[in-house]
């Protein structure tokens, strides 16, 4: 069973080991962390640079074996009542155990009950069907909005999704 706790500085060393190839890196980060490979220092810098912001909440999911997942919740701009998932990733060894679904459900619960959000959003790339199906399984629906990113000289289309309280 998974639990959540706030991200700690040393968590970045474990999290970056889950990003094993360039494709995974860009699906996870949209390139917001620079180029592959990502270092623990670069992830830590990105997270800690925003952690004091009252609208940015990084979490790790853990079980008895240690941390198994990571994500952030943030308020996009000045949109009150809305939080957005970002940097959602699961330890590859934990996949297939329902941990992705559990982690998202815990994050949604935090967003609605602790932070008072009425809507939670996220974006997922079309070329990431396993993540898309996981998001749908916890109740996210497409909201009709999408963006196209130029990643590795290819156009990657994102699908915006949301879940409302």
List where the protein language model places each region:
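Residue-level detector of family-conserved "landmark" positions at structurally sensitive sites
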Residues: 29, 104, 121-122, 145
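Alpha-helical segments that scaffold the active site and NAD(P)H-binding pocket
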Residues: 105, 136-137
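C-terminal "cap" of GNAT-fold acetyltransferases
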Residues: 83, 118-121, 125-131, 137-141, ...
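Extreme N-terminal starter segment of soluble prokaryotic enzymes
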Residues: 1-3
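Glycine-rich phosphate-binding loop
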Residues: 98
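Acetyl-CoA-dependent GNAT
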Residues: 6-12, 17-95, 104, 110, ...
């Amino acid at each position: 069973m998974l639990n959540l706790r706030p991200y700690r500085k040393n968590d970045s060393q474990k999290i970056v080991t889950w990003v094993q190839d360039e494709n995974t890196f860009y699906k996870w980060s949209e390139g917001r962390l620079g180029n592959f490979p990502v270092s623990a220092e670069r992830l830590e810098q990105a997270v800690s640079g925003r952690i004091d912001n009252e609208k940015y909440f990084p979490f790790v999911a853990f079980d008895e074996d240690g941390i198994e997942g990571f994500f952030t919740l943030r308020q996009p701009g000045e949109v009150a009542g809305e939080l957005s998932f970002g940097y959602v990733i699961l330890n590859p060894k934990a996949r297939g155990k329902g941990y992705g679904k559990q982690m998202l459900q815990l994050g949604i619960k935090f967003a609605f009950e602790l932070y008072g959000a009425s809507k939670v959003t996220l974006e997922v790339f079309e070329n990431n069907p396993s993540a898309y199906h996981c998001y749908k399984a916890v109740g996210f629906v497409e909201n009709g909005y999408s963006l196209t990113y130029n990643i590795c000289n290819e156009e990657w289309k994102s699908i915006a999704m949301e879940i409302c309280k």
